[in-house]
């Protein structure tokens, strides 16, 4: 990476030559070995060249293409520069030296997503009256976004065709369910509840499978309830971005925005860093704290069996907010709403659900641990600011979107009631999931609805940690918690490990020389799914056991035929698919209102079906060699004029089922 810049040339047109620097809102160089900072004249000269190329390119563009993303991709001296218009008059430019191995779609997607992250947190650039404040916010969010990608550039390229070329859409989960009773329960008991009706704008529920490469078709947004949620793609892609970077370490720290990636060796640990074994840096202090709290914990367990002693429970709740990592003092939330006032409530020692971000967090923590403030847009209304709370159940992540002036979220009883109701809904959801032992599919698909922006995709999710595993020379990455003083780091050390563990692909001992896998380590005193704490703590989204990862990656009895490919082969395949699809899409401007089908054969023998229309794009990859001679004969006898039907009975059955489901 060379640089990232944000500029507004319209400002320069209004100012004298001596004020030309005002058009440059942000310029960040990634060249850490540079002896001197880039001179201001050199920055302005670069922006001037980019803008000149931009005007030359787009003055001759067809009017029909104006509705799409406007960008330029050019080579300037030693570097490749991609510039995108993110707002009217505001541009973002990115310089990189990649030998043009990857299509510009990869970088256009990241530029737009970094802008969308900025807009979620700060609003539109045009809303800023103070240039200095705008630059500060760009440094915080845009530079932070790209700095993380600089440490793990594999995250840019380890993306499917769907996420790269359909960056304005959002991935939906295709989890197969027997019924939708859980949806009705959420609507009636939470959304339409008298206490929530005026304040709760929407709920978004995501399925984020934690099993190895994950089931690609099941990954994504399972349900949102508000009609015409126009910011849903930006919010969903923000969640997916955090998940791809931090993977199984998606926690309260990450969602609150207080974690940054850092390259770590065997040198002295950085300030704010926690050890990968979930132990604080001071082992003596940790043992002392355990000795102090253990008698209180045992007393609490005994008294809980007697009954619901309100005064004592209130006191112990305060102690619970200070101690973390002890199963006897955590997970104290009654799971069902009708048990809240029961004198004989059975309290579980392990609760696999709870709030990640909510006002129930420690008061000493920063505000972002109690709620996230995002600017979102619903229907045709102007964007407004909302408060977001985060809740999880196993590998489901739920986002509550509240109006900013709704003060009920500060009521602990209200939040605990929501927690109990949503837990009941998740039990209903889990009971309705259809579990079948499917054989590997002979085809993979991607469908993009241009009206709703929904993406259905079964292309394997390529994890960049797989690609890093062959690069033993790379230094391990650490996750550093920032913005929390040493006392809180100590008190919350049991909830979050900042060192990404390292492991080999065989049974050798784990150590610093092992290959990197970006995952959270498994605690030795808890089951593989128990990285959870009570809602008064800093919660960690359900983790992943390394043995499960290796087993799932080697298992080809589910998913599609592409799951058996290596990460390097998947990467090459996605780059080629992006190149082919982009070339076809660029010629759409003169084919308005026409549906076009194409069937291509790749060099590896895979058939690539592409259908483009004004409302929907459909992509299908088919392994023709997996069809037996009877299936091929059946395909030849097909009388349909559609190329899709010539791909085989399995593709036809999937397409017909999908069509019937949408009707």
Curated annotation (Swiss-Prot):
Region entry Disordered, spans: 503-529
GO biological process: autophagy; protein transport; vesicle-mediated transport
InterPro entries: Ccz1 (IPR013176), CCZ1/INTU/HSP4_longin_1 (IPR043987), CCZ1/INTU/HSP4_longin_3 (IPR043989)
Keywords: Autophagy, Endosome, Membrane, Protein transport, Transport, Vacuole
Subcellular location(s) of the protein: Endosome, Multivesicular body membrane; Prevacuolar compartment membrane; Vacuole membrane; Vesicle
Bilayer disposition of the protein: Peripheral membrane protein
Pfam families the UniProt entry points to: Intu_longin_1 (PF19031), Intu_longin_3 (PF19033)
GO cellular component labels: intracellular membrane-bounded organelle; Mon1-Ccz1 complex; multivesicular body membrane; vacuolar membrane
Origin superkingdom: Eukaryota
Biological role: In complex with MON1, is required for multiple vacuole delivery pathways including the cytoplasm to vacuole transport (Cvt), autophagy, pexophagy and endocytosis. The MON1-CCZ1 complex acts at the fusion of vesicles with the vacuole, through its regulation of the SNARE complex during the coordinated priming and docking stages of fusion, and particularly at the stage of tethering/docking.
Subunit structure comment from the entry: Forms a complex with MON1.
UniProt family annotation: Belongs to the CCZ1 family.
Protein name: Vacuolar fusion protein CCZ1
